[in-house]
Amino acid sequence: STRKESSAASDVYKRQGELLALYGSAYNVNIRVFNDIQHTITGWPGGKPNADDSNRPERATPYPKKVIIFSPHPDDDVISMGGTFHRLCEQHHDVHVAYETSGNIAVGDEEVIRYCEYLRDVCAKYTEDETVKKKAEEIIHFLRYEKVEGEAEKRDVLFMKGTIRREEARAGARYSGIKSDDHIHFLDLPFYETGLVKKNDLSEADIAIVKKLLTDVKPDEMFVAGDLADPHGTHRVCLNAVLAAIDEL
């Protein structure tokens, strides 16, 4: 099995001959790649205290660090770096998580109906005030009988969808190790809030929100998600917001 894998690897290098021309053999290429990658892998994502950090991807000091994890949607933190998130908290760093957009349009209408029915029934049980109960019934009726596909979402529906995602994100952050709710930040960047799949362009209003968070927290380390293959995607826009904020500070 090992011989077959080695032969297959050699065939790849033969077809992509430039690497062999540069390094002489497949073995040399493998060693070079291994040496480059090994120093980017660590069990101490915030840096290992009281250790030589000359060959580590993150410096040992200061310890503990103030860390911000930027999550484009309210789930990208745990999807893309859940283990790292947990390890940072486990190793006693001061971890903040910033959800850059509400992610509201990803929530299905049936979810909103279910939560509104729950809200309606709770209000009917515990309060005589009809305000919230009537609003829940209004949203349920709209989604079941009046909504037209392709139109921008109503603000009340967007609020409900955003709230559902917000509480899911809060639960995920707590599970990952966040102890205090004031370390969970919902930025609700304005470029996202169109109610449609198509979003607005990044603006100074978005950048200002990120700048304020950076100024308030003063992080020693940041983790930023970004899909560089899609220049108009939400992940790329969120990355650009952080980079622009850093440039302006």
Language model feature labels by segment:
Residues S1, S6-P74, V78-E248:
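Active-site beta-strand->loop->alpha-helix modules in alpha/beta enzyme cores, enriched
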